[in-house]
Amino acid sequence: MTTSEPCLTLSSPADVLAAVPYLVGFHPDDSLIVIGLAEGEARVATRWNLPLPPGALAPLAPLFDREGITQAVVVGYGPGERVTPAVDEARLLAARAEVEVEEALRAHEGRYWSYVCGLARCCPPEGTPYDVATSHVAAEATVRGLVALPDRQTLERTIAPASGPVRLAMRRATAEAVADIRATLAAAPDTDAFATDFVTDGLARVRTALASHASGGRLDDGEAAKLGLDLAIIRIRDEAWTLTDESHVPFWKDLTRRLEPRFIPPVASLLAMASWRGGDSILATIALDRALTINPGYSMANLLTHALHHLLSPRILRGRLPTPAELDTAMGPPHAAWLLPLVALLDEERPVAA
């Protein structure tokens, strides 16, 4: 992730360990964290699951170069046999990139070990106890509004499918929206004209929904279901894409939880885009996992996954996202073929139990 967090002052290994959960959004385990610094401030914080697959750290050198990283801190969480090879590889890649590793730590079961310091008086073989909960860094981070969830699973649950009455109500609203579209489409004498009207209305609904969110509103079930159908159309989804802002994260989170599964890939991908733009690559990755679990071939999700795997910065998009007018020029006027992704989803509709 690209860090945009308020500055925290770190002066010891214990401070680093206390800060990491706030940099990645949760308390990691079985993980490798690399924090890149420039001019003494954290610019990026990246995380990998352990054990590392071959080549997982290859994007580090290009990342260091793009972000102007001159120093790094490496932290591994877990037992030595799992952490040490990963830390060694990260340190080697940093050295090749002429990035100085200021500290390299392993943390496990409430103790840490330094790979940089070999002095027994400060870094004993049995490890040094630490407690992130009592650290001044944790207190400072909390005051500054930073949050560290207990683990990655807790973060995953923030966009898990809604259940119970919420799910049942959304299922009914979706069935009604699908029935309405089917009836209107079946009665349309000209499918090209229907496509034009549908896309025009869908573009307006996207902008209205985002404006409502900005003023504190929330889509009701019927509006959410309708927007889920709209976003199946690539041109309508791309309208939302061109408008992406990190402030949209709660909006797309809500829809990722509420929509029926087959309508999730567009909204989860838009959530990933907004999260990535805001520097939260962990949430972006989780959202993309949701999208690709449902539709492994969904192109927007695969494109963003490629960017995240290569540790690309969202800054590459500055000035490069097309405008709505440019999308219209590139894609041409709406026509019946634009409806095919939506029609495929309509065909998947199942009866709702009474």
Task: Specify the residue positions occupied by each region the protein language model found.
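Short acidic-glycine loop/turn motifs at beta-strand connectors
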Residues: 37-41
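Short beta-strand scaffold segments in enzyme catalytic cores
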Residues: 32-36
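Charged, compositionally biased boundary regions
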Residues: 2-22, 27-29, 43-354
